[in-house]
Protein backbone atom coordinates (compact mmCIF):
# COMPACT_ATOMS: atom_id res chain seq x y z
CA UNK A 1 0.00 0.00 0.00
CA UNK A 2 1.28 3.47 -0.88
CA UNK A 3 1.90 6.16 1.75
CA UNK A 4 0.41 9.62 1.17
CA UNK A 5 1.75 12.66 3.02
CA UNK A 6 -0.36 15.72 3.74
CA UNK A 7 0.93 19.18 4.50
CA UNK A 8 1.83 19.95 8.12
CA UNK A 9 2.78 23.13 9.89
CA UNK A 10 5.53 23.79 12.44
CA UNK A 11 6.47 20.99 14.82
CA UNK A 12 7.76 20.55 18.36
CA UNK A 13 8.86 16.93 18.52
CA UNK A 14 11.44 14.59 20.02
CA UNK A 15 12.70 11.33 18.53
CA UNK A 16 15.26 8.68 19.39
CA UNK A 17 17.80 7.88 16.69
CA UNK A 18 17.90 4.20 15.72
CA UNK A 19 21.23 2.38 16.00
CA UNK A 20 23.86 2.95 13.34
CA UNK A 21 23.73 0.56 10.40
CA UNK A 22 27.41 1.07 9.63
CA UNK A 23 28.56 0.31 13.16
CA UNK A 24 26.22 -2.69 13.42
CA UNK A 25 27.56 -4.33 10.24
CA UNK A 26 31.17 -3.93 11.33
CA UNK A 27 30.64 -5.00 14.92
CA UNK A 28 28.85 -8.17 13.81
CA UNK A 29 31.52 -9.09 11.26
CA UNK A 30 34.38 -8.49 13.67
CA UNK A 31 32.63 -10.37 16.49
CA UNK A 32 32.10 -13.30 14.11
CA UNK A 33 35.86 -13.41 13.45
CA UNK A 34 36.92 -12.82 17.04
CA UNK A 35 38.37 -15.21 19.59
CA UNK A 36 35.65 -15.80 22.19
CA UNK A 37 32.13 -14.53 22.73
CA UNK A 38 30.88 -11.02 22.09
CA UNK A 39 27.68 -9.24 23.05
CA UNK A 40 26.61 -6.56 20.57
CA UNK A 41 24.25 -4.31 22.53
CA UNK A 42 21.67 -2.12 20.81
CA UNK A 43 22.28 -3.32 17.24
CA UNK A 44 20.19 -2.11 14.34
CA UNK A 45 17.72 -4.79 13.37
CA UNK A 46 16.79 -4.09 9.76
CA UNK A 47 16.86 -5.87 6.42
CA UNK A 48 20.50 -5.09 5.68
CA UNK A 49 21.88 -6.08 9.07
CA UNK A 50 19.76 -9.25 9.15
CA UNK A 51 21.32 -10.22 5.82
CA UNK A 52 24.74 -9.81 7.40
CA UNK A 53 23.70 -11.92 10.40
CA UNK A 54 22.43 -14.75 8.20
CA UNK A 55 25.54 -14.65 6.02
CA UNK A 56 27.82 -14.82 9.05
CA UNK A 57 25.83 -17.76 10.36
CA UNK A 58 26.32 -19.48 7.00
CA UNK A 59 30.05 -18.85 7.47
CA UNK A 60 30.07 -20.68 10.78
CA UNK A 61 29.47 -17.98 13.39
CA UNK A 62 27.04 -18.80 16.20
CA UNK A 63 24.82 -15.70 16.52
CA UNK A 64 21.87 -15.58 18.91
CA UNK A 65 19.35 -12.75 19.19
CA UNK A 66 18.76 -12.08 22.91
CA UNK A 67 17.01 -9.31 24.88
CA UNK A 68 20.47 -7.84 25.58
CA UNK A 69 21.52 -7.86 21.94
CA UNK A 70 23.30 -10.27 19.63
CA UNK A 71 25.49 -12.88 21.33
CA UNK A 72 28.19 -13.93 18.90
CA UNK A 73 30.53 -16.87 19.34
CA UNK A 74 33.46 -16.03 17.12
CA UNK A 75 35.30 -18.32 14.74
CA UNK A 76 38.79 -17.07 15.73
CA UNK A 77 39.47 -16.04 12.17
CA UNK A 78 38.55 -19.40 10.68
CA UNK A 79 35.02 -19.18 9.21
CA UNK A 80 33.75 -22.65 8.42
CA UNK A 81 31.10 -23.07 5.75
CA UNK A 82 29.69 -25.87 3.65
CA UNK A 83 31.05 -26.55 0.20
CA UNK A 84 29.13 -24.55 -2.38
CA UNK A 85 27.93 -21.91 0.09
CA UNK A 86 25.98 -19.12 -1.61
CA UNK A 87 25.46 -15.80 0.16
CA UNK A 88 22.50 -13.96 -1.36
CA UNK A 89 22.85 -10.45 0.01
CA UNK A 90 19.76 -9.13 -1.83
CA UNK A 91 20.10 -5.33 -2.08
CA UNK A 92 22.67 -4.83 0.69
CA UNK A 93 25.78 -3.43 -0.93
CA UNK A 94 27.45 -3.05 2.45
CA UNK A 95 26.94 -6.72 3.26
CA UNK A 96 28.20 -7.97 -0.09
CA UNK A 97 31.25 -5.75 -0.23
CA UNK A 98 32.37 -6.22 3.37
CA UNK A 99 31.81 -9.97 3.32
CA UNK A 100 33.68 -10.48 0.05
CA UNK A 101 37.02 -10.29 1.87
CA UNK A 102 35.75 -12.33 4.83
CA UNK A 103 35.02 -15.13 2.34
CA UNK A 104 38.78 -15.36 1.75
CA UNK A 105 39.17 -16.81 5.24
CA UNK A 106 36.67 -19.63 4.74
CA UNK A 107 37.69 -23.28 4.67
CA UNK A 108 35.61 -24.17 1.59
CA UNK A 109 37.72 -25.58 -1.24
CA UNK A 110 35.08 -24.46 -3.74
CA UNK A 111 35.02 -20.87 -2.53
CA UNK A 112 32.02 -18.79 -1.49
CA UNK A 113 29.53 -17.38 -3.99
CA UNK A 114 28.29 -13.85 -3.31
CA UNK A 115 25.27 -12.57 -5.20
CA UNK A 116 22.36 -10.18 -4.83
CA UNK A 117 19.44 -8.42 -6.46
CA UNK A 118 19.40 -7.30 -10.11
CA UNK A 119 20.44 -3.81 -8.96
CA UNK A 120 23.27 -5.31 -6.91
CA UNK A 121 24.53 -7.00 -10.05
CA UNK A 122 24.86 -3.54 -11.63
CA UNK A 123 27.06 -2.18 -8.82
CA UNK A 124 30.78 -2.56 -9.56
CA UNK A 125 33.16 -4.51 -7.32
CA UNK A 126 36.02 -4.99 -9.79
CA UNK A 127 38.37 -2.76 -7.82
CA UNK A 128 37.87 -4.95 -4.75
CA UNK A 129 38.28 -8.11 -6.80
CA UNK A 130 41.59 -6.88 -8.21
CA UNK A 131 42.90 -6.13 -4.72
CA UNK A 132 41.80 -9.55 -3.44
CA UNK A 133 43.78 -11.20 -6.23
CA UNK A 134 46.82 -9.06 -5.47
CA UNK A 135 46.68 -10.16 -1.82
CA UNK A 136 46.64 -13.84 -2.75
CA UNK A 137 42.97 -14.68 -3.16
CA UNK A 138 40.86 -15.71 -6.13
CA UNK A 139 37.79 -14.00 -7.60
CA UNK A 140 35.75 -15.49 -10.42
CA UNK A 141 32.88 -13.49 -11.91
CA UNK A 142 29.86 -15.52 -12.98
CA UNK A 143 28.30 -12.95 -15.32
CA UNK A 144 29.72 -9.51 -16.16
CA UNK A 145 33.39 -9.01 -15.35
CA UNK A 146 33.81 -6.85 -12.25
CA UNK A 147 30.24 -7.29 -11.01
CA UNK A 148 28.38 -9.77 -8.78
CA UNK A 149 27.68 -12.62 -8.72
CA UNK A 150 31.19 -13.85 -8.02
CA UNK A 151 33.02 -16.71 -6.33
CA UNK A 152 35.69 -15.72 -3.80
CA UNK A 153 38.29 -18.16 -2.52
CA UNK A 154 41.31 -17.80 -0.26
CA UNK A 155 43.90 -17.75 0.96
CA UNK A 156 44.46 -14.21 2.14
CA UNK A 157 48.24 -14.07 1.99
CA UNK A 158 48.76 -10.35 2.54
CA UNK A 159 51.24 -7.94 1.06
CA UNK A 160 50.62 -4.66 -0.72
CA UNK A 161 47.63 -3.67 -2.87
CA UNK A 162 46.60 -0.38 -4.43
CA UNK A 163 43.00 0.81 -4.77
CA UNK A 164 41.60 3.83 -6.56
CA UNK A 165 39.15 4.92 -3.84
CA UNK A 166 36.81 6.93 -6.06
CA UNK A 167 33.92 4.45 -6.27
CA UNK A 168 33.49 3.24 -2.69
CA UNK A 169 35.39 3.26 0.59
CA UNK A 170 33.73 -0.09 1.35
CA UNK A 171 36.34 -1.87 -0.77
CA UNK A 172 39.02 -0.61 1.61
CA UNK A 173 36.93 -1.39 4.70
CA UNK A 174 36.32 -4.91 3.42
CA UNK A 175 40.03 -5.67 3.15
CA UNK A 176 40.82 -4.01 6.48
CA UNK A 177 38.25 -6.14 8.33
CA UNK A 178 39.81 -9.38 7.09
CA UNK A 179 43.43 -8.16 7.20
CA UNK A 180 44.34 -9.31 10.75
CA UNK A 181 44.01 -12.92 9.59
CA UNK A 182 46.30 -12.64 6.58
CA UNK A 183 49.54 -14.62 6.64
CA UNK A 184 51.58 -11.44 6.26
CA UNK A 185 50.88 -7.77 7.03
CA UNK A 186 48.39 -6.08 4.72
CA UNK A 187 49.47 -2.76 3.26
CA UNK A 188 46.78 -0.84 1.36
CA UNK A 189 47.57 2.22 -0.71
CA UNK A 190 44.81 4.44 -2.08
CA UNK A 191 45.60 6.36 -5.24
CA UNK A 192 43.06 9.14 -4.63
CA UNK A 193 41.32 10.55 -1.58
CA UNK A 194 38.62 7.95 -0.98
CA UNK A 195 34.96 8.90 -1.14
CA UNK A 196 32.93 8.45 2.05
CA UNK A 197 36.18 8.34 4.00
CA UNK A 198 34.40 8.78 7.32
CA UNK A 199 33.31 5.15 6.96
CA UNK A 200 36.98 4.17 7.07
CA UNK A 201 37.14 5.87 10.46
CA UNK A 202 34.15 3.80 11.57
CA UNK A 203 35.91 0.64 10.40
CA UNK A 204 39.09 1.59 12.24
CA UNK A 205 37.21 2.52 15.41
CA UNK A 206 35.39 -0.82 15.62
CA UNK A 207 38.55 -2.80 14.80
CA UNK A 208 40.41 -0.97 17.56
CA UNK A 209 37.58 -1.64 20.01
CA UNK A 210 38.07 -5.37 19.41
CA UNK A 211 41.84 -5.13 19.89
CA UNK A 212 43.28 -4.62 16.41
CA UNK A 213 44.68 -1.19 15.48
CA UNK A 214 44.91 0.15 11.95
CA UNK A 215 47.96 2.27 11.22
CA UNK A 216 47.23 4.87 8.58
CA UNK A 217 48.74 7.90 6.92
CA UNK A 218 45.81 10.18 6.17
CA UNK A 219 43.39 8.20 4.03
CA UNK A 220 45.88 7.01 1.44
CA UNK A 221 47.93 4.37 3.28
CA UNK A 222 46.62 1.71 5.69
CA UNK A 223 48.59 -1.07 7.38
CA UNK A 224 47.30 -3.97 9.49
CA UNK A 225 49.61 -6.48 11.17
CA UNK A 226 48.62 -10.13 11.70
CA UNK A 227 46.52 -10.24 14.88
CA UNK A 228 43.31 -11.60 16.43
CA UNK A 229 40.13 -9.80 17.39
CA UNK A 230 39.10 -10.37 21.00
CA UNK A 231 35.46 -10.92 21.92
CA UNK A 232 33.89 -8.23 24.10
CA UNK A 233 30.71 -6.33 24.90
CA UNK A 234 30.11 -3.57 22.41
CA UNK A 235 27.32 -0.98 22.30
CA UNK A 236 26.22 0.42 18.93
CA UNK A 237 25.78 4.18 18.85
CA UNK A 238 22.87 6.07 17.29
CA UNK A 239 22.71 6.82 13.58
CA UNK A 240 23.14 10.34 12.22
CA UNK A 241 21.92 9.26 8.77
CA UNK A 242 18.53 8.21 10.14
CA UNK A 243 18.43 11.23 12.44
CA UNK A 244 18.76 13.50 9.41
CA UNK A 245 15.13 12.88 8.42
CA UNK A 246 13.93 14.10 11.81
CA UNK A 247 16.23 17.11 11.74
CA UNK A 248 14.92 17.90 8.27
CA UNK A 249 11.37 18.03 9.64
CA UNK A 250 12.32 21.09 11.68
CA UNK A 251 14.05 22.67 8.69
CA UNK A 252 11.21 22.07 6.23
CA UNK A 253 8.14 22.47 8.46
CA UNK A 254 9.49 25.01 10.92
CA UNK A 255 9.54 24.66 14.70
CA UNK A 256 11.98 22.39 16.49
CA UNK A 257 12.97 18.75 16.68
CA UNK A 258 15.22 17.03 19.22
CA UNK A 259 16.90 13.74 18.37
CA UNK A 260 18.33 11.73 21.26
CA UNK A 261 20.81 8.82 21.30
CA UNK A 262 23.50 10.63 19.32
CA UNK A 263 27.21 10.64 20.10
CA UNK A 264 28.62 14.17 19.89
CA UNK A 265 32.11 12.77 19.31
CA UNK A 266 31.04 10.29 16.65
CA UNK A 267 33.23 9.70 13.61
CA UNK A 268 30.09 9.39 11.46
CA UNK A 269 30.45 11.67 8.46
CA UNK A 270 26.72 12.35 8.36
CA UNK A 271 27.16 14.65 11.35
CA UNK A 272 27.93 17.18 8.62
CA UNK A 273 24.19 17.40 7.93
CA UNK A 274 23.73 19.27 11.21
CA UNK A 275 26.33 21.83 10.18
CA UNK A 276 24.64 22.18 6.79
CA UNK A 277 21.31 23.03 8.43
CA UNK A 278 23.04 25.59 10.63
CA UNK A 279 24.58 27.20 7.55
CA UNK A 280 21.11 27.36 5.98
CA UNK A 281 19.74 29.32 8.94
CA UNK A 282 18.64 26.76 11.51
CA UNK A 283 19.53 27.02 15.17
CA UNK A 284 21.50 24.06 16.52
CA UNK A 285 21.55 23.22 20.24
CA UNK A 286 23.70 20.47 21.67
CA UNK A 287 21.77 18.47 24.26
CA UNK A 288 23.11 15.98 26.82
CA UNK A 289 22.52 12.96 24.59
CA UNK A 290 21.39 14.50 21.35
CA UNK A 291 20.83 17.57 19.18
CA UNK A 292 17.96 20.04 18.74
CA UNK A 293 17.32 21.74 15.40
CA UNK A 294 15.05 24.79 15.31
CA UNK A 295 13.95 26.96 12.40
CA UNK A 296 12.12 30.24 12.86
CA UNK A 297 13.19 32.11 9.71
CA UNK A 298 13.70 31.43 6.01
CA UNK A 299 16.20 28.85 4.83
CA UNK A 300 19.11 30.09 2.73
CA UNK A 301 20.82 28.23 -0.08
CA UNK A 302 24.41 27.11 0.43
CA UNK A 303 27.29 25.49 -1.42
CA UNK A 304 28.67 22.44 0.36
CA UNK A 305 30.87 19.41 -0.30
CA UNK A 306 29.10 16.28 0.99
CA UNK A 307 31.76 13.75 -0.02
CA UNK A 308 32.04 12.57 3.58
CA UNK A 309 28.27 12.49 4.20
CA UNK A 310 26.77 10.62 1.23
CA UNK A 311 23.73 9.18 2.99
CA UNK A 312 22.35 12.64 3.81
CA UNK A 313 22.73 14.18 0.35
CA UNK A 314 19.11 13.45 -0.56
CA UNK A 315 17.86 14.79 2.76
CA UNK A 316 19.77 18.00 2.18
CA UNK A 317 18.44 18.22 -1.37
CA UNK A 318 14.81 18.18 -0.24
CA UNK A 319 15.53 20.82 2.40
CA UNK A 320 17.24 22.91 -0.29
CA UNK A 321 14.07 22.79 -2.39
CA UNK A 322 12.42 25.00 0.24
CA UNK A 323 15.21 27.57 0.61
CA UNK A 324 15.10 31.13 -0.71
CA UNK A 325 18.11 30.71 -3.01
CA UNK A 326 19.88 27.90 -4.87
CA UNK A 327 21.96 25.21 -3.18
CA UNK A 328 24.86 23.38 -4.80
CA UNK A 329 25.95 20.05 -3.35
CA UNK A 330 29.27 18.67 -4.57
CA UNK A 331 30.97 15.34 -3.97
CA UNK A 332 28.00 13.35 -5.24
CA UNK A 333 29.36 11.53 -8.30
CA UNK A 334 29.74 8.18 -6.53
CA UNK A 335 26.05 8.17 -5.53
CA UNK A 336 25.21 6.70 -8.93
CA UNK A 337 26.47 3.37 -7.54
CA UNK A 338 24.09 3.24 -4.57
CA UNK A 339 20.79 1.33 -4.27
CA UNK A 340 19.67 3.56 -7.13
CA UNK A 341 21.42 6.26 -9.13
CA UNK A 342 20.66 8.74 -6.38
CA UNK A 343 21.74 11.84 -8.27
CA UNK A 344 19.51 11.07 -11.26
CA UNK A 345 16.59 9.91 -9.10
CA UNK A 346 16.79 12.93 -6.79
CA UNK A 347 17.00 15.38 -9.68
CA UNK A 348 14.17 13.72 -11.57
CA UNK A 349 11.89 13.58 -8.55
CA UNK A 350 12.51 17.19 -7.55
CA UNK A 351 11.78 18.29 -11.11
CA UNK A 352 8.54 16.32 -11.08
CA UNK A 353 7.49 18.26 -7.96
CA UNK A 354 8.30 21.66 -9.49
CA UNK A 355 12.00 22.35 -8.89
CA UNK A 356 14.62 23.26 -11.43
CA UNK A 357 17.67 21.05 -10.93
CA UNK A 358 21.05 21.06 -12.65
CA UNK A 359 23.39 18.07 -12.42
CA UNK A 360 26.97 17.52 -13.50
CA UNK A 361 29.50 14.75 -13.01
CA UNK A 362 30.01 15.51 -9.31
CA UNK A 363 27.42 18.13 -8.34
CA UNK A 364 23.73 18.83 -8.08
CA UNK A 365 22.23 22.33 -7.89
CA UNK A 366 18.68 22.83 -6.63
CA UNK A 367 16.84 26.01 -7.66
CA UNK A 368 13.82 26.45 -5.37
CA UNK A 369 10.46 27.20 -6.92
CA UNK A 370 6.75 26.63 -6.33
CA UNK A 371 6.24 22.97 -5.43
CA UNK A 372 3.25 20.71 -5.85
CA UNK A 373 2.28 17.17 -4.95
CA UNK A 374 2.88 14.05 -6.95
CA UNK A 375 3.55 10.33 -6.90
CA UNK A 376 7.10 9.26 -6.14
CA UNK A 377 8.75 6.01 -7.16
CA UNK A 378 11.68 5.52 -4.74
CA UNK A 379 13.28 2.92 -7.03
CA UNK A 380 13.55 0.48 -4.12
CA UNK A 381 15.82 2.97 -2.34
CA UNK A 382 15.11 3.49 1.35
CA UNK A 383 16.80 6.89 1.50
CA UNK A 384 14.81 8.26 -1.43
CA UNK A 385 11.56 7.23 0.25
CA UNK A 386 12.45 8.78 3.60
CA UNK A 387 13.87 12.02 2.20
CA UNK A 388 10.86 12.68 -0.01
CA UNK A 389 8.48 11.79 2.81
CA UNK A 390 9.92 14.80 4.62
CA UNK A 391 9.35 17.01 1.59
CA UNK A 392 5.87 15.55 1.22
CA UNK A 393 4.94 16.77 4.70
CA UNK A 394 5.98 20.29 3.68
CA UNK A 395 4.27 20.28 0.27
CA UNK A 396 1.27 18.00 0.77
CA UNK A 397 -0.44 15.50 -1.53
CA UNK A 398 2.78 13.54 -2.07
CA UNK A 399 2.43 9.78 -2.36
CA UNK A 400 5.39 7.45 -1.80
CA UNK A 401 5.14 4.15 -3.64
CA UNK A 402 6.61 1.02 -2.04
CA UNK A 403 6.95 2.62 1.42
CA UNK A 404 8.12 -0.71 2.86
CA UNK A 405 11.53 -0.19 1.21
CA UNK A 406 12.55 1.82 4.30
CA UNK A 407 12.90 -1.54 6.06
CA UNK A 408 16.41 -1.76 4.62
CA UNK A 409 17.75 0.62 7.27
CA UNK A 410 14.87 2.09 9.33
CA UNK A 411 11.89 -0.30 9.62
CA UNK A 412 10.12 1.92 12.15
CA UNK A 413 10.39 5.13 10.14
CA UNK A 414 6.68 5.40 9.36
CA UNK A 415 5.80 4.44 12.93
CA UNK A 416 7.99 7.28 14.19
CA UNK A 417 6.23 9.81 11.95
CA UNK A 418 2.84 8.48 13.05
CA UNK A 419 3.83 8.73 16.72
CA UNK A 420 4.71 12.37 16.09
CA UNK A 421 1.24 13.01 14.68
CA UNK A 422 2.51 13.50 11.13
CA UNK A 423 0.57 10.68 9.44
Swiss-Prot record:
Q: Where in the cell is it found?
A: Cytoplasm
Binding locations of phosphoenolpyruvate:
21, 93, 123, 170, 342, 383, 408
One biological-process term from Gene Ontology? Answer: chorismate biosynthetic process
Q: What class of enzyme is it?
A: transferase
**CC annotations in GO:** cytoplasm
- CDD domains listed in its UniProt record: EPSP_synthase
Q: Which Pfam families match?
A: EPSP_synthase
GO MF annotations for this entry?
Answer: 3-phosphoshikimate 1-carboxyvinyltransferase activity
Keyword tags: Amino-acid biosynthesis, Aromatic amino acid biosynthesis, Cytoplasm, Transferase
Reaction(s) catalyzed by this protein? 3-phosphoshikimate + phosphoenolpyruvate = 5-O-(1-carboxyvinyl)-3-phosphoshikimate + phosphate
Domain of life of the native organism: Archaea
- Coiled coil ranges: none
**Record-linked SUPFAM superfamilies:** EPT/RTPC-like
Query: Which PROSITE patterns has this protein been placed in?
Result: EPSP_SYNTHASE_1
Q: What is its EC number?
A: 2.5.1.19
Query: Where is it predominantly found?
Result: cytoplasm
Q: For 3-phosphoshikimate, which residues are the binding ones? A: 21-22, 26, 168-170, 196, 311, 338
Quaternary assembly:
Monomer.
Q: What does this protein do?
A: Catalyzes the transfer of the enolpyruvyl moiety of phosphoenolpyruvate (PEP) to the 5-hydroxyl of shikimate-3-phosphate (S3P) to produce enolpyruvyl shikimate-3-phosphate and inorganic phosphate.
Name by which UniProt lists this protein: 3-phosphoshikimate 1-carboxyvinyltransferase
Amino acid sequence: MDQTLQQHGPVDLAFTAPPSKSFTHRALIIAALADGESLIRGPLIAEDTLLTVRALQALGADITDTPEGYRVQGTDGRPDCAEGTVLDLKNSGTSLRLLSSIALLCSSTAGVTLTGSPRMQQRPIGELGDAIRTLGGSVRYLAADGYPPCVVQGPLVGGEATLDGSVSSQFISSLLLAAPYAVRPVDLKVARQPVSRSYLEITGAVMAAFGVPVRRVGYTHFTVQPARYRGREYTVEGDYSSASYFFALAATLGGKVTVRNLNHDSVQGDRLFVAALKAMGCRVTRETDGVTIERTKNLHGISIDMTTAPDTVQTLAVVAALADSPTTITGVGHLQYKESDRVAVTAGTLRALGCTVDISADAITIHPGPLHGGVIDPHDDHRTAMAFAVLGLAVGDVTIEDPACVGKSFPKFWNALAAGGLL
